[in-house]
Amino acid sequence: MILYLVFVMVPIGFNLGPLALNGVRLVLLVMILPLMTQLLAGKYDGVFVFDILFILHILWAVVALAVNNPNQVIQNIGSVGAEFLGGYVLARAYIRTPADFLALCRFLVLSVCLTLPLAVYETVTGRPILLELINKLPGITAVANVIYERRMGLDRVQLAFAHPIHYGLYCSVAFSLAFVALSDVSRPVWRYVSSAVLGFCCFLSLSSGALLALILQMFLIGWSWLFGKTPRRWLMLVGLFGLLYLTVALLSNRTPMKVFMSYATFSAATAYMRSIMMDWGMVNVWSSPIFGIGLNDWVRPASIHSNSLDNFWLLMAMRYGIPGFTLLVLGYGLAILQIGHRKFDGDPVLTHIRRAWVFTFLGLSFTLTTVAVWTSIYSFVFFMFGAGVWLIKARPQGADPAGADSRAASGTDAVARTGSDAPQRAALRRWAAPALTAAPALTPAPAPVPALAPQAKAADPSPPILAEVPSRHPSRTGTATRYSRFAHRSGLRDPGPDDPDPDDPDPNDIGPR
């Protein structure tokens, strides 16, 4: 899995015969079939409704492409299916405990912080050093260097991603993880410094979509802190958003979505272009609502020369039709609702992990209305989505130990898992080891068990011991005698003066058992 994350940041490409592959696709093509088999067998905390919806989304995409582009079905679905389902199921398989998730958070935060010198150099000089180095390697290709006009006197940082907005989105995903998820296992100084670095790197992408996700996450964090003791604070927030939407709809001659997009851009020209894309995108959706238009070019005004569409959700509806779009959105929304409604009272670590994941994807959901994602970052988005699904079955510290024991005995508990993924999981956990060892105890340490007094406990036998050594005779005297012999022989306590000699025959014993 670490190899997958490295290839997300450094999308090295190469040709394998007629196939154009990159590191992410190669890893996922190798792993998707065994991991998907295990997922459908319920090995990764069960099979959820949204698992089925995501699979149906890809199957419908196959149908839509077969109708529109029959000669490109295998090639396109092979890459899109591997990136979408492969990234999702990889996270479902390897991120299933708090330690796994915290290790992932540390990896992402550290990876972004390490890009700071490269990002500063690129935004000042306009030279993506990492891309230039990759392109010098024999037999290896990298993504194209995207040239844009400078904004605010700075070049947009692309690093090694396919687009500057992808770098900004990668940085924004790590923000809530650094500030919220790691709050119980990191020192405050590290949290604030790393969060500031993440925000600065996100800014250097000079992408309105990425900055929108960052600002929305900061707003949600502030709202949670300000109204932390208010029971219905999130219902209040939904009500405020609804009131704001209604107010804009009544007072503006534009739709609320167009007003929102006009303020979520760096320039009025960009806002105008996105408004036209929205209008003509819906024209294409309604022209082919069932199977979409597939990979065919979309109808648009002559003034829009590029065939790109800066709206991921609209692109899904346009390409695969309303059924494909609906399956994806239902699965996406259902998972967020289920995870968002989980309560982890008494376990601050799980509470902060859940909150950070929900904040991340609430921000990302709005951002995807202003950007499109493809290739490695497309897979990464749904990898991070799958990385939070384990929270649905997670149990807070000290809750239902009997249930936890039964899960461990059946092999479904994360702690009891062993198998082929053990080396990779051990490697990933080492990233979280410093934080976990330095963190305060999540629950009070159990009080030491006092030594049993010889006389006090002789007449008060423990029920579990009696259950382990039942007597064939229900007489109280026989039961006490058998318990005394068992306790003496087992070393559970010292013999009392009234205890029988363990070597004497038992009067209640009628023969071998």
Segments predicted by a language model, with ranges:
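Loop-to-helix entry and N-terminal half of a specific, functionally important transmembrane alpha helix
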Residues: 2-7, 238, 338-371, 382, ...
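N-terminal hydrophobic segments of proteins, predominantly signal-anchor/transmembrane helices
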Residues: 1-17, 24-86, 365, 494, ...
